[in-house]
Amino acid sequence: MNYFPWLTIIVVFPIFAGSLIFFLPHKGNRVIRWYTICICILELLLTTYAFCYHFQSDDPLIQLVEDYKWIDFFDFHWRLGIDGLSIGPILLTGFITTLATLAAWPVTRDSRLFHFLMLAMYSGQIGSFSSRDLLLFFIMWELELIPVYLLLAMWGGKKRLYSATKFILYTAGGSVFLLMGVLGVALYGSNEPTLNFETSVNQSYPVVLEIIFYIGFFIAFAVKSPIIPLHTWLPDTHGEAHYSTCMLLAGILLKMGAYGLIRINMELLPHAHSIFSPWLMIIGTIQIIYAASTSLGQRNLKKRIAYPSVSHMGFIIIGISSLTDTGLNGALLQIISHGFIGAALFFLAGTTYDRIRLVYLDEMGGIAIPMPKMFTMFSSFSMASLALPGMSGFVAELIVFFGIITGQKYLLIPKLLITFVMAIGIILTPIYSLSMPRQMFYGYKLFNAPKDSFFDSGPRELFLSISIFLPVIGIGIYPDFVLSLAVDKVEVILSNFFYR
């Protein structure tokens, strides 16, 4: 038991500090911006300090454990704890949220509410990644949805209300299945109902009941990830949201679905996961091809960027369903890798729109000359998205490939077939990834426009882009920095499939 409440402070601090925004003096938006950025930086430093000095990466057990009785009536506890699975997403959340607040600098309408919602979303996401109580996990999951809905509905494009409504209908529908799964697992406790995740992990369930629980949790996480055919909210949401909100969606929110698949479907329900893993492998393979094929038909730049998120999720699903430590480590690395790359591409798409006021690719062209810095950064992250060697995406996809090939669960012919189809998807990926910068920056359409109407990236955009690009290169060169966090926990999870 940890005696200093590090995780409670880390979870509560952003939303508590965010609520003070409404009491700041009315002296313009600058005070609110700087206050929010300082809160995010302080939170990131606090998280980094706590993990550096109080977390042992070679220990697969839950660390920084906190357990406080909250509601006596039905034995509801405030249980927090982290392990190798959650530390990476928590640090990613802190990093991307800090940069997203910097990206939101141009937002001036209702800036107090906007920045409060970003900080509230921050708390909900960290709470989801660190919860060790099933009901607390559900509460944090829902807490994070409310700010996202308001950010979508109040700041964005002309169809923002439609996209926000579609988002909340999909996610609320998924949350119903999540709540049913949580209550089902809780009520089927060994002797008495329990919401404790550790107790539930050690509990054995009848196969039929475990399959029912698995399907319920899977639907909830498939909506958030997203997994086809429950992905249709994603392009509309990304197409209408402000680009700082898109950074949070692509960088963190989608990763919560993948985290839930590993944390609950895989760790809590291993027998059902073993049964469903061949089907997940097929879904992941179809998803890679589907996203690569559909992306080419998107005229909207932000929708074109949204579909690679679906494709990358396909690799994560395949890694999770490979039932090998190599494949699962590759999936975890892909979660972190795409968090950086997706956030960067949406930021660059948004800043480009701020300058040229065009969002359809067939209306763009020839802006490489007046905006060379933007061209360089966008091209670099497009290369990272297509998994160029030396960048994080390449290592993640390569490890997932090795996970399939070395897996013992599947026969040789199915493994070769899945690998072949994945290879086709990888061949299609450069087509849609490189067609974006070609349509935007090459050609002639905007070449003769007045050069003073365009201005290139400023210090804020350069700082933000470089801040994301450095981890992408760093992980690509030395992936063990991320892999070492979860390697022991991955072995423990996979041991359930062979020794339980």
Curated annotation (Swiss-Prot):
The chain crosses the membrane at residues 4-24, 35-55, 87-107, 134-154, 167-187, 208-228, 242-262, 272-292, 305-325, 330-350, 386-406, 411-431, 462-482. It holds the Pfam family Proton_antipo_M. It catalyses: a plastoquinone + NADH + (n+1) H(+)(in) = a plastoquinol + NAD(+) + n H(+)(out); a plastoquinone + NADPH + (n+1) H(+)(in) = a plastoquinol + NADP(+) + n H(+)(out). Keywords: Chloroplast, Membrane, NAD, NADP, Plastid, Plastoquinone, Quinone, Thylakoid, Translocase, Transmembrane, Transmembrane helix. It is a multi-pass membrane protein. It is found in: Plastid, Chloroplast thylakoid membrane. One of its GO terms (molecular function) is NADH dehydrogenase (ubiquinone) activity. GO terms for biological process: aerobic respiration; ATP synthesis coupled electron transport; electron transport coupled proton transport. GO terms for cellular component: chloroplast thylakoid membrane. It is an enzyme of class 7 (translocase). InterPro entries: NADH_Q_OxRdtase_chain4, NADH_Q_OxRdtase_chainM/4, NADH_UbQ_OxRdtase, ND/Mrp_TM. The keyword Transmembrane applies. Its EC number is 7.1.1.-. Its main location: plastid. HAMAP family: NDH1_NuoM. Belongs to the complex I subunit 4 family. This is NAD(P)H-quinone oxidoreductase chain 4, chloroplastic. It comes from Solanum tuberosum (Potato).
